[in-house]
Amino acid sequence: MQRSPLEKASVLSKLFFSWTRPILTKGYRQRLELSDIYQIPSADSADNLSEKLEREWDRELASKKNPKLINALRRCFFWRFMFYGIILYLGEVTKSVQPLLLGRIIASYDPDNKEERSIAIYLGIGLCLLFVMRTLLLHPAIFGLHRIGMQMRIAMFSLIYKKTLKLSSRVLDKISIGQLVSLLSNNLNKFDEGLALAHFVWIAPLQVTLLMGLLWDLLQASAFCGLAFLIVLALFQAGLGRMMMKYRDQRAGKINERLVITSEMIENIQSVKAYCWEEAMEKMIESIRQTELKLTRKAAYVRYFNSSAFFFSGFFVVFLSVLPYALIKTIVLRKIFTTISFCIVLRMAVTRQFPWAVQTWYDSLGAINKIQDFLQKQEYKTLEYNLTTTEVVMENVTAFWEEGFGELLEKAKQNSNDRKISNADNSLFFSNFSLLGAPVLKDISFKIERGQLLAVAGSTGAGKTSLLMMIMGELEPSEGKIKHSGRISFCSQFSWIMPGTIKENIIFGVSYDEYRYRSVIKACQLEEDISKFAEKDNIVLGEGGITLSGGQRARISLARAVYKDADLYLLDSPFGYLDVLTEKEIFESCVCKLMANKTRILVTSKMEHLKKADKILILHEGSCYFYGTFSELQNLRPDFSSKLMGYDSFDQFSAERRNSIITETLRRFSLEGDAPVSWNETKKQSFKQTGEFGEKRKNSILNPVNSIRKFSVVQKTPLQMNGIEEDSDEPLERRLSLVPDGAEQGEAILPRSNMINTGPTLQRQRRQSVLNLMTCSPGNQGQSFHGRTASSTRKMSLAPQANLTEMDIYSRRLSQDSGLEISEEINEEDLKECFIDDVESIPPVTTWNTYLRYVTIHKSLVFVLIWCLVIFLAEVAISLVVLWLLKKTASQDKGNSTQSINSSYTVIFTSTSTYYVFYIYVGVADTLLALGFFRGLPLVHTLITVSKILHHKMLHAVLQAPMSTLNALKAGGILNRFSKDIAILDDLLPLTIFDFVQLLLIVIGAVTVVSALQPYIFLATVPVIAAFIMLRAYFLHTSQQLKQLESEGRSPIFTHLVTSLKGLWTLRAFGRQPYFETLFHKALNLHTANWFLYLSTLRWFQMRMEIIFVIFFIAITFISILTTGEGVGAVGIILTLAMNIMGTLQWAVNSSIDVDSLMRSVSRVFKFIDMPAEESKPPTKSFKPSKDVQLSKVLITENHHVREDDIWPSGGQMTVKDLTAKYIDGGNAILENISFSISPGQRVGLLGRTGSGKSTLLSAFLRLLNTEGEIQIDGVSWDSITLQEWRKAFGVIPQKVFIFSGTFRKNLDPYGQWNDQEIWKVADEVGLRSVIEQFPGKLDFVLVDGGCVLSHGHKQLMCLARSVLSKAKILLLDEPSAHLDPITYQIIRRTLKQAFADCTVILSEHRIEAMLECQRFLVIEENKVRQYDSLQRLLSEKSLFRQAISPSDRLRFFPHRNSSKHKSRSQIAALKEETEEEVQETRL
């Protein structure tokens, strides 16, 4: 970044903003890079500002019982704020005085007032000086206020972030990530722009008082008629504003509904294609869009009338002010012109400035109060450590995640009594609520000496993670004592990767030791992975380590924990995503050897780990079930494996299952209170699942994939699209609605982070607490099938280096000695790297081609524009007729000017009134005829239709695009098109285009009229308009690029916040908060650099426009004064019109810039529409939903791809020849020359290390990748049939389960092919019936938020049911048991045996016992097939499979390998049943 010229700029350069010229010139000539942006002035740096505000806030906290953030802000910023306010007031006063001088100039042309003629020239000079003065005062004042607003925002952002890092886990459990992000996003730039309007709260009333005083002098009491009309108008506009908010609230619910399904579709686009659901999804989204557009139209019409009311009010204000006075007394022309000029200023003050100022204060104070409440939340307390202690001791410790649980239990009991549940269910219900108030850990005691390994085991939700949290100080014990030295290292259950290099992630700010670092990498099996990169361990990882596989992320997290030299290592299920072989090696080399002399606490459920541990602690429902050694365990607790694995026996299979479903379901409804059920009582209590941590986690751990949801639709809740998410107990925020047009929601867009919050955060999200975010795996951990983006699917070794994220900017290399010494300079190369994903290939200024395409996309639009032009020509013609009459009357007037006019009646019809009538029409330049009032409606209506067409085309294009194209895009980027850009096309663009067309026509009309009066003026107008057009073109190139860089600069702020929250426990365990605060300040400074420069260049442009206008006005004033002879009218008309033409022309130029900026959204949408399609499909009927389609009604659509007589495939034989697969065109091959064949009905297991390409092979079968080679099914080659028909041959159970928002029926059968009887039959087969029957509405129960009420196991069963319903002959399973509880796992195994007995099954799996049912195995290593053989052959050779099975397992599974095949098989089956519990690995 370059040094800012502002630092060396002179006073004049600062006053006129000339210091921005170098960047404007550069931006005009070439594309701006981040390195071209100037550094921020030190006064604006986040470090200085946050330190200042933090000091004042601490003072406020210390000195008062009831601290107020506004007081701290006042002490920091008040005097500068007032200084600029006074300058702004002086600038506004000049506007009020101008009409006085104008009146005097007009009076000097009165034939009876010849003595004043001599001073007309001086009055002209005075008038011009007022304009010059206003220009010099106004722009520096507005810029100064913008800057103070920006500084306030930066200081508050920093304070919020610092507070977030200090919050206690209990508080984090109650705050959702959406609330935190909205706390920042809603206030981003709200203060910057709002502060300039804030002063009008006192300026506008003073101005109105001054103007009314001057008008009283002219018109006496009748002046108040005009003011009364304006006040009524302001109230009318406020009423329209409220009406618009009502429509917008209704519509926001529909927008939310549409975006929920769209986001689910984009996230799971691979599943949508695999299931051939493109048409079903398209029709579902389009039907919601239909309803949404009806409400959009209503809101647009209201807003159109609101806008028109302002334009047309000018006529009535003047008319009502002048009319009573004219009827009582005679009126001279001078007074009319002066009144017109006064009324223009008055109208602006009453209907725009004052309401906007009140709205700004209302919004800003609301935001400040919310931030103040947040800053007073409870912070976490670190435990008092004893550095001399060597052992870890816990004595009788009990802890609760929730405070005040007793009260909650009472409420819960009361609540369930109200519901009158039957006795059978009641016991379940209460057993559940007793958990709510139960401690998460009860009376836990243990002691481990230095160097010992303690293994902690237990079923899901037993309190294992809570135990580690307690040792770290994240959870406070309510009784008992904990003792340890305090030097802790921690490895989280869900691997957390910070943006930066692999090396930075492992060292994590600890001093660098080469030998230690190499040992750790070797022990964690990272050497091979790192060697595949050109940059080795200096490769920059994207947000969340998205380019890595789950196993690679897990190993890096473990390496980070091991690298730190600590006394106590807490390892929370570090092996969750590793394959059996890797896990075994790492446990041996890392946990047992490298850390042999360290104290370790390992959470695990593996028998091998328990055997090697010095001590074992088994937890069950928060209590200590067993503590001792492994041999003691075998003697004392023979039933331990059932407690460890979380189930007692398969004998009570169905009862246990039913019980778990009911309790799970009831718990979710009663505690979350946001499911769409009719239990309003629960909603009122608004329990937010504040139970013990184990119970809370059960929800997210059995369900890890849905844990990070972007949107949710909560039925019948009105939502707003402007990114505000209120506290759950607060009513929907009602804006004061004084402002008619309000800030539209198009711009308040959230970060384009892949993991979370892509697109706007919609209000009333399903509450996903921050704690949940920290305890949940990202949706795409350890998978490549159904990956969210190219980056998530590409494994570490294959990721191209271009794909970096915004965060890479400021994740600088950690210094060798200490992570805290971060260089202030941001490396330019990194700045460039950072935006590679996001830089759009759209030219800085919208091309004419885009405009042409937009106008011609709907045939009516051209006619509507012609219609506007015709009406305008009619209006100009009327003006010219009036002008002709005026000249005629004026010439008559000269003849009989002596005629006395006594009658007040005739005075209205004198020559004066012809001037008056004429001016009222064009003079205010917006008082058009009644016809004009409605002329814009067809335009607005047609533009919304265009938006509908574009949305439809874009949705179709995305659904039909090949995966290679979609892989190259970010999920957030695609969703932004459907949220932000479509919102702009619906809301902002139609009215902005209408405003622009209206203003442009007004200017042309006014210029025509003035030129007819005084031809010299036409000569002055032409160069001025030319200068405006050139200035606009010059400025536009730079401003659009700066805006783009600014919006890209927002992403790192939010990405960093979310990243920090996900890894908060790790951060605090390593004490890295100061480093992350520094990184956050860097992100803020980067955004500030772009925003500050944008504000400065904008002021430069506005000031230049004002200067051109002042020069033009000076020229016009002197031309008219020197060339006009006798006659009051002409000078009055010319000067009043000139003042107005320029104001309107400035507005028109600004409006054209807005149109250009908004048309970029159209360019982006066209870019998506032009994406290539996968393959042409058979023609299908176009879909028009009926007028009253609602989401709650089941939408049955015809599936055109299913043929009645379809008998292919019949057997399921599969032949693969020379298959090569790539993720993107021209990328590296992920699989090379794969050839093998599968007999009908055979089961094939895929073996290979994490990231070897097993999931990729399954994707290639479905033609989701760029493939070469050939696959045949039952002799039919994939080239000979359509894609849809090919994919129909497969049933798929993906690793990432896809449940969209809709009914159970819709989720199982989106095309509506099967009747209820068939669906129930299949639900029965896969064990889903008991689940579905628990819900009100059964099959018609609407699932929301990725099926949040279902456990992960239930979702897997849904996928299984889909496959059974599809009657596919080949079944692909991608790690179906990754997160399953043992019961669901057994159901899936049983169903595979029964329902798919005669199908070909291809299985990718980590569990050994699941693989044993396969007849053949395909071993993949280094992108190629290493072996393809039977189980017996693999066990006899030195294969990967043989290495993965420990000798004890081999004995257990294959005791009589030499006996006959049949006997061996039945033996295996029997043994499997017996030993199921021992080998079961419950994924956490």
Swiss-Prot record:
TM spans (from-to): 78-98, 123-146, 196-216, 223-243, 299-319, 340-358, 861-881, 921-941, 993-1013, 1016-1036, 1098-1118, 1133-1153
Keywords: ATP-binding, Cell membrane, Chloride, Chloride channel, Endoplasmic reticulum, Endosome, Glycoprotein, Ion channel, Ion transport, Isomerase, Isopeptide bond, Lipoprotein, Membrane, Nucleotide-binding, Nucleus, Palmitate, Phosphoprotein, Repeat, Transmembrane, Transmembrane helix, Transport, Ubl conjugation
Phosphoserine found at: S549, S660, S670, S686, S700, S712, S737, S769, S792, S797, S815, S1448, S1460
GO molecular function: 14-3-3 protein binding; ABC-type transporter activity; ATP binding; ATP hydrolysis activity; bicarbonate transmembrane transporter activity; chloride channel activity; chloride channel inhibitor activity; chloride transmembrane transporter activity
Lipid-acceptor residues (S-palmitoyl cysteine): C524, C1399
Binding positions for ATP 2 per the UniProt entry: Y1223, G1248, R1249, T1250, G1251, S1252, G1253, K1254, S1255
Positions bound to ATP 1: W401, S434, G458, S459, T460, G461, A462, G463, K464, T465, Q493
Post-translational note: N-glycosylated. Phosphorylated; cAMP treatment promotes phosphorylation and activates the channel. Dephosphorylation decreases the ATPase activity (in vitro). Phosphorylation at PKA sites activates the channel. Phosphorylation at PKC sites enhances the response to phosphorylation by PKA. Phosphorylated by AMPK; this inhibits channel activity.
Region entry Interaction with GORASP2, spans: 1390-1484
Motif (PDZ-binding): 1482-1484
Stretches assigned to the ABC transporter domain: 423-646, 1214-1447
Glycosylation sites: N896, N902
Spans within the Cytoplasmic topological domain: 1-77, 147-195, 244-298, 359-860, 942-992, 1037-1097, 1154-1484
Protein function: Epithelial ion channel that plays an important role in the regulation of epithelial ion and water transport and fluid homeostasis. Mediates the transport of chloride ions across the cell membrane. Possesses an intrinsic ATPase activity and utilizes ATP to gate its channel; the passive flow of anions through the channel is gated by cycles of ATP binding and hydrolysis by the ATP-binding domains. The ion channel is also permeable to HCO(3)(-); selectivity depends on the extracellular chloride concentration.
Name of this chain's protein: Cystic fibrosis transmembrane conductance regulator
Organism expressing this protein natively: Mustela putorius furo (European domestic ferret)
Lineage: Eukaryota, Metazoa, Chordata, Craniata, Vertebrata
